[in-house]
Design a protein with these regions (language model features):
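Active-site neighborhoods and metal-handling regions in enzymes and metal-associated proteins
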Residues: 1-342
């Protein structure tokens, strides 16, 4: 049975993807891996890890700035430090940052029902990092970041435990170390948490892929001699954004003699009759991304192209047959030809 797909809207007459469950399950996965590890807390600067942890998003313009950061500890729920305007927006529209399931994080005086309690302090806070060095070190921002993190670790009794970080700028690392915090690699904890997808995550990945299906249909109609690779990129980007993509990360549009070796970047090359043309469409829908390839023959395919397609299809079918829980990439590549054979 395939994964169901729905419209991109929410409706009152049909149960679709449950975003509350998505948020709850992701945090539960992360806390499970955190509690299995040797670290007391996780600090994230990576855009995707912040979103996975806290379900906050401020637009993909900030994806490479390393200016936002988020912390989750064994004894508390996520805290996100963000631009002041963004922090205020989170406070208004991200109510999950004001509740917790952790006793040490809860407001002991606030009434509550069940396991979810109001927090003693909001998880939506104003605060920024060094913007990849754009702020002069004399401003002392790195030490301010370290001070914020140290306060939370002290508050929750974890100052003497290692702090796992996904990525970090050196001024921040040095400031944390000066504050007496032991910093270790936290990337694998995030990766372990994200490895097994929830039902909602699979649904979002399927929805993201279905949007690329639509883009490829338009691309099939568009491809002909005389159009350029960059025009194909523009077409795909428009289709995806019109369908609700939040970020078209890239479209590899590669044709003719540019197909081998793969240059990983499109050009303004004119597509010619009989060209092979392959595409890789990378985009994000609700934070779930595609890397979805398709190859076309422009006009008609030669006998050599037919033979190459047949061989490639056989390789793919062998690999797909091995995809199951517990399989590794080593199992897959074992049935593929060695690179030297090409």
């Amino acid at each position: 049975m395939t994964t169901a797909t729905f419209g991109t809207n929410q409706v009152d007459w049909e149960q679709r993807l449950d975003f509350d469950k998505l948020r709850t399950d992701r945090l539960a996965n992360l806390k499970r891996e955190l509690n299995k590890s040797d670290v007391g807390a996780l600090l994230a600067f990576d855009f995707a890890n912040i979103r996975y942890m806290s379900s906050t998003h401020i637009g993909t313009w900030a994806i490479d700035k390393a200016i936002r950061f988020a912390l989750v500890t064994r004894n508390s729920d996520p805290i996100v430090w963000d631009f002041g305007s963004a922090a205020k927006h989170h406070k208004l529209y991200n109510p999950w940052l004001d509740t917790t399931t952790a006793e040490a994080d809860a407001d002991p005086h606030a009434p509550h029902h069940g396991a979810v309690k109001p927090r003693a302090e909001s998880g939506a806070r104003a605060g920024i990092s060094t913007l990849r060095g754009a702020f002069n070190p004399d401003a002392g921002i790195a030490d301010e970041v370290a001070s914020k993190i140290k306060r939370e670790l002290e508050k929750f009794g974890l100052l003497n435990e290692p702090l796992g970080i996904d990525i970090v700028e050196l001024p921040i690392l040095f400031a944390l170390q000066r504050a007496g915090i032991t910093v270790v690699d936290g990337q694998q904890i995030f990766l372990n948490a994200r490895a097994i997808k929830t039902g909602e995550e699979i649904g979002l990945l399927t929805q993201a892929a279905s949007m690329v299906d639509a883009a490829y249909e338009k691309l099939y109609e568009f491809l002909r001699p005389g159009v350029k690779e960059n025009e194909a990129v523009g077409l795909v980007s428009k289709v995806l954004y019109d369908l609700g993509s939040e970020y078209v990360e890239g479209v590899n549009a590669i044709s003719g003699e540019r197909c081998s070796p793969h240059p990983h970047v499109y050009s303004d090359r004119l597509i010619r009759p009989g060209d092979p043309a392959f595409f890789d469409i990378l985009h994000s829908y609700q934070g779930y991304r595609t890397c979805y390839y398709r190859t076309f023959a422009v006009g008609s395919a030669s006998s050599a192209q037919h033979d190459a397609y047949k061989r490639a299809r056989e390789y793919m079918d062998r690999a797909i047959a091995l995809v199951r829980p517990g399989a590794t990439t080593a199992d897959i590549v074992a049935v593929w030809p060695k690179a030297e054979e090409f």
